[in-house]
Amino acid sequence: MSKLDEQLIALGAVFEAATLVDRIARTGQVPNAALGCMLGSLLARNPQTTLEIYGGDDLNLRDGYRALVGALERDSSSLQREPLRYALAMIGLERQLDKRGDMLQVIGSRLDQIQQQVEHFGLTHENVVASFGGLYQDTLSTFRQRIQVQGDMRHLQQSDNAAKIRALLLSGIRSARLWRQLGGHRWQLIFSRRKLLDALYPRLRSTQSEDR
């Protein structure tokens, strides 16, 4: 797998988290498999490949790839504005997090504790999701730059939905960190659009064929 493909998997995961946040905010619903994929990426230890972080295939990143394609094509009919806003905000927050070694240490320690919870309850259990959400609230939510999620207040005010949204934002920021560690940079989204799209189209097609 090329370096660019590795970057696209991580960037696709940022956009996947963003689309799931938007879906919960608008509908109160989220596919359990996609939620599990993103939460599982927070606990991946010593993966052999980037894809392994997301369960070994990118089927559950398909909606993220679609949103990323829409952003890179700059086609108003396919552009998903809120997910794009959330994705860019997560990339921005990761840059701030990178300067906070103390916070990174806290996050690492708390994720170890959550791993123990997962072994007892399961990855998408409400107690585990609440712990992920609480970790986001205690760390990244304290930055001056906050991600303002727009949607239906009936869904946003439900505590379990709020926890899922925070947990997904945490996973998106983790994927943004991975993307940058793999050599990804925001300038690519402006100056390397065609190169990214040429590599992204086959990845998106492969996830669609797997689903049939």
From Swiss-Prot:
Record carries keyword Nucleotide-binding: no
Membrane-protein topology: Peripheral membrane protein
Cited PANTHER family: HIGH FREQUENCY LYSOGENIZATION PROTEIN HFLD (PTHR38100:SF1)
Highest taxon of source: Bacteria
Protein keywords: Cell inner membrane, Cell membrane, Cytoplasm, Membrane
GO cellular component: cytoplasm; plasma membrane
Record bears the keyword Nuclease: no
InterPro entries assigned: HflD, HflD-like_sf
Family statement drawn from the similarity comment of this UniProt entry: Belongs to the HflD family.
Localization annotation: Cytoplasm; Cell inner membrane
Name this protein carries in UniProt: High frequency lysogenization protein HflD homolog
